[in-house]
C-alpha cells in the first residue's frame, strides 16, 4: 500500500509498480527521479530501440475515438471564444462587450468554463493580441484590440480518458494589415502543401520542412514545428 506522506516520486513509482506487476520498460526520456524510485520495486529496462515510442505512435480505434471526442469539445470551446470576439463592439480601438472591454482573461474563462462543463480541462491556454502574438507562448493579458491579430491556442485534456486535443486559430476583429494577411496566407499555403505531401509517419512530415527552417514561399520563420 502507498503510505501517507510518501514523497511524490515514490508514491507514483509505487502505484506504477503495483500496476505493472513485473519488469518495466521505459523510454530514454523517462524522468530519472521516477526511474530511480521504480528500481526499488521492479527491474527497470531502458528502451533503447524505441519500442515504447513506436507502440504509442500507432493508435487503436478506441484511442482514435477518444481523441476525436476531446477534439469535438475543443472545437466547440474555440467557437465560444471566437463568438465573443465576433460579437464585440470596437470603441477607441478596444473591443467591448456588455459595456466593458473584452479581455484575454474573459475569452479564456469562457472557453475554460465550456471545457469544464464537458469533462475537459484547459491548461496554458493562449489568448494573445497584437505584439504579444510574436511571443510563441505568451498567455495574453488585458483588453483585445480592433484590427490586431488575436491568437487563440487551447490544449485541453479529457478528465476521464486523459487524451488531449490541440487547436490554434488566428482571428481579427476589423481589418488586418497587409502584413498580417500575407503571414496568414503563407501559413495557409504551407499547411495545404504539407497536407498534399503527408506520409504515414509523423517524422516524414518534419522532413518536408527545409533544412534552414524557413517556410517558403513567404520567407517567414516556421516557429515551433518540433511536434509535427
Give, region by region, the residue ranges found by the protein language model.
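Active-site neighborhoods and metal-handling regions in enzymes and metal-associated proteins
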Residues: 1-228
Amino acid at each position: 500500500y502507498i503510505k501517507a506522506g510518501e514523497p511524490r516520486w515514490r508514491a507514483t513509482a509505487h502505484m506504477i509498480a503495483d500496476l505493472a506487476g513485473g519488469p518495466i520498460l521505459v523510454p530514454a526520456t523517462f524522468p530519472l527521479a521516477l526511474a530511480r524510485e521504480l528500481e526499488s520495486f521492479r527491474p527497470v529496462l531502458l528502451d533503447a530501440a524505441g519500442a515504447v515510442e513506436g507502440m504509442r505512435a500507432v493508435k487503436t480505434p478506441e484511442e482514435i475515438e477518444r481523441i476525436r471526442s476531446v477534439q469535438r469539445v475543443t472545437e466547440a470551446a474555440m467557437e465560444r471564444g471566437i463568438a465573443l470576439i465576433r460579437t464585440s463592439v470596437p470603441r477607441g480601438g478596444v473591443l467591448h462587450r456588455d459595456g466593458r472591454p473584452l479581455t484575454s482573461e474573459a475569452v479564456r474563462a469562457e472557453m475554460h468554463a465550456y471545457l469544464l462543463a464537458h469533462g475537459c480541462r484547459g491548461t496554458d491556454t493562449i489568448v494573445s493580441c497584437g505584439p504579444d502574438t510574436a511571443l510563441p507562448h505568451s498567455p495574453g493579458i488585458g483588453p483585445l484590440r480592433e484590427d490586431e491579430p488575436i491568437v487563440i491556442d487551447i490544449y485541453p485534456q479529457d478528465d476521464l480518458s486523459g487524451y488531449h486535443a490541440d487547436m490554434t486559430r488566428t482571428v481579427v476583429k476589423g481589418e488586418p494589415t497587409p502584413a498580417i494577411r500575407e503571414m496568414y496566407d503563407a501559413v495557409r499555403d504551407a499547411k495545404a502543401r504539407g497536407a498534399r505531401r503527408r506520409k504515414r509517419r509523423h517524422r516524414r512530415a518534419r522532413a518536408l520542412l527545409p533544412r534552414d527552417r524557413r517556410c517558403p514561399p513567404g520567407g517567414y520563420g516556421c516557429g515551433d514545428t518540433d511536434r509535427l
